[in-house]
Amino acid sequence: MTFVKKSFKNTLILSVLMIMVSPLIIENVSAQSSAQSEADRAREERNKRDGQRTKKSQAVSKSVYEKITKAQEIMEAGDNDGALKILNALRASSKLSEYEQQNVLNYLGFVYYNMEDYPRAMRAYEDMLKIPSIEEQMAKTTTYTLAQLNTMEENYTKAISLIQRYFQLETNPPPAAHILYAQNLYQLERYKEMIPPIETAMENDLRRQKAARQMAKEKAEVELKKARGEEEIAAATVKLRDATRRANMEPIIKEDWYSLLNFAYFQQENFSKVRDIQKILLIHYPKKRYWFSLAGAYTELGEDEKLIYAYDAAHTQNMLEKSVEFVTMAQLYMQAEVPYKAATLLDTEIKNGRVDKSEKNYRLLSQAYTLAAEDEKALPALKAAAKISDEGEMDLRLGNAYLNLAMYGDCVTSVRSGLKKGKIKSPDNAQISLGMCLYNEKEYLDAIEAFKAASKTNRSKRIAGQWISVIESDIERNRQIELAEAAAKKQLDDLKRRRDQAAAARI
């Protein structure tokens, strides 16, 4: 069905557009946390003056640390320009070690990011990567941040190159990195290549969730063993029970990841995969658009018999809202040979104002009632459709409904109205219906004229001729009856006259 297919495609595109705007803003907060962690590490190193200090090249001097901290405080107070002034002054110093340059550039990049000056933020991070002695972890973080920023700036090819470099540096990348890779591939319309990174992200995420839950369970078990006193034991028992329950539950993948994978498979026309993904989404994220997408997948796979179940489920959960959605549901009921259900749905929603009061919808309602053998209930819908329409077809249908209900006078009025409007698909059939109604109203001459008009087409010539013969026979029979009745009356009158004459003679 057209609406189902259109809704199917629109839902997939909307889902991808939604996922494209969300992860980057969240992920880039890592830039700030990296800068803070480096500053904290420098402070810790300064406190280890008992011989456990790191190499000089990996230390931050007191003055540099204090200025970075000051810049951080100023930025958090909302003075980005003040923070930049301090950091740029530091950067200009020729006395900075490579490690100190690394920390200054890292925080400088974050300030620019906070100001939404992404090009300058990227330049700062790119300069960081040029430092020969940059720490491995910092190189990983910076490369990934640059990939995110290039994605935001729509430099998708460069972003892909950076992510690939990040994968070379990071042996165990987070699932979100694979999703970022897939998002950039999407922007370049490399849809087939999207599938492996998304599925890798899902597999890794499931593994991480299971491991984290198992660790939480084991930790809770240890805490219970260490617990003392009734309250402490009770609290530890509850915690272990919750941790055990979570460990036994199947982890749930993020909704937007499924949406992205769904779109990738859709572009490959792998509708069986699309169908399976919709079913998973409906288990964890039961939303209207996924029922429609499932219905669309069934349509593409030729599994039309299952289409109604998807739509009916959405209807049962009160997810249908638009007129076209209710009409589609009614059409599916009719295809499934449950026309009465279609009729009651349309009737109710037209009265509620959620289905448009159009000729098309009233016609569908009348068809549903007619197929359900509820001709009388079809009349109001047919009347409404005939009133709206400037074509005679609906008047003819109304006339035929009256004919079926033996309401012949109304039938004549409606069919004549339809013939007057014109634009009837089969005028000969209209004349036959008119002739039948006129015949039952005993308007024989007008009925003959209607059947003569119908007989002008080869299709209706025979049946019209048969009706004319029937009417002429009825007219002749009625004439014979009238003659017989007249003769009988004459005989009765003559008999009465003779009796009257005989009675008078006796007097």
Where are these predicted regions, by residue range?
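N-terminal leader/linker segments that initiate helical-solenoid repeat arrays
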Residues: F8, V21, I25-E126, S133-T141, ...
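Solenoid-like repeat scaffolds
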Residues: R53-A59, R91-S97, L129-E135, Q164-N172, ...
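Alpha-helical adaptor scaffolds
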Residues: E359-A373, P380-N429
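Generic helix N-cap/helix-start motif at coil->alpha-helix transitions
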Residues: V60-I68, E98-L105, E135-T145, E170-L180, ...
